[in-house]
Swiss-Prot record:
PANTHER family: TRANSLATION INITIATION FACTOR IF-3, TRANSLATION INITIATION FACTOR IF-3, MITOCHONDRIAL. Signal peptide: none annotated. It holds the Pfam family IF3_N. Its main location: cytoplasm. It comes from Methylorubrum populi (strain ATCC BAA-705 / NCIMB 13946 / BJ001) (Methylobacterium populi). GO terms for molecular function: ribosome binding; translation initiation factor activity. It is found in: Cytoplasm. Disulfide bonds: none annotated. Monomer. Keywords: Cytoplasm, Initiation factor, Protein biosynthesis. This is Translation initiation factor IF-3.
Length: 173
């Protein structure tokens, strides 16, 4: 049995290689197994299209529908589903080991806002020059970030050193 076309279900004469179909009329009533050409003639009498709903069943299930309206409604459903879908972004907050209190507070407000929007946050702590020798200061700073966000976020990846920066990823709860 040929697979359905890529742009939706087959309709009318596009349905090929079938002798009988399980027919459902426009009111949703099951008419039983009917020869394909009889079903096509009945659809034309009613002024609707014969649309293949379940091509993989034996015999294939076909229904009387207005094919144009059917395609329109399917497209509408897909668009609605796409609108409801939220893509999770990873936002980055860059810190330094010697960050001042006010600067830290501003960064934490941004982190809170990102979590409210449902985004993940990548906290990057960059070491410059000899600061790399004092990784414990950076680790304490990232632990502080972790403590302050523990109610709204969970740690996805623990702080780890990559080159001259320490990275931690937080995800909203």
């Amino acid at each position: 049995m040929p697979a359905p076309q890529k742009d939706g279900p087959r309709a009318n004469r596009d349905i090929r290689g079938v002798r009988d179909v399980q027919l459902i009329d426009q009111d949703g009533q099951n008419r039983g197994v009917v020869p394909f050409f009889d079903a096509l003639a009945m659809a034309e009498e009613v002024g609707l299209d014969l649309v293949e709903i379940a091509p993989n069943s034996v015999p294939p299930v076909c229904k009387f529908l207005d094919y144009g309206r059917f395609r329109f409604n399917e497209q509408k459903k897909q668009n609605e589903a796409r609108k409801r879908q939220k893509t999770v972004e990873v936002k980055e907050i860059k810190l330094r080991p010697g960050i001042d209190k006010h600067d830290y507070d501003v960064k934490m407000k941004a982190v809170q806002r990102f979590f409210e929007e449902g985004d993940k946050v990548k906290v990057t702590l960059r070491f410059r020059g000899r600061e790399i020798a004092h990784q414990d200061i950076g680790l304490r700073l990232l632990e502080r970030v972790k403590q302050e966000t523990q109610e709204v976020a969970k740690v996805e990846s623990e702080p780890m050193l990559e080159g001259r920066q320490m990275i931690m990823i937080l995800a909203p709860r």
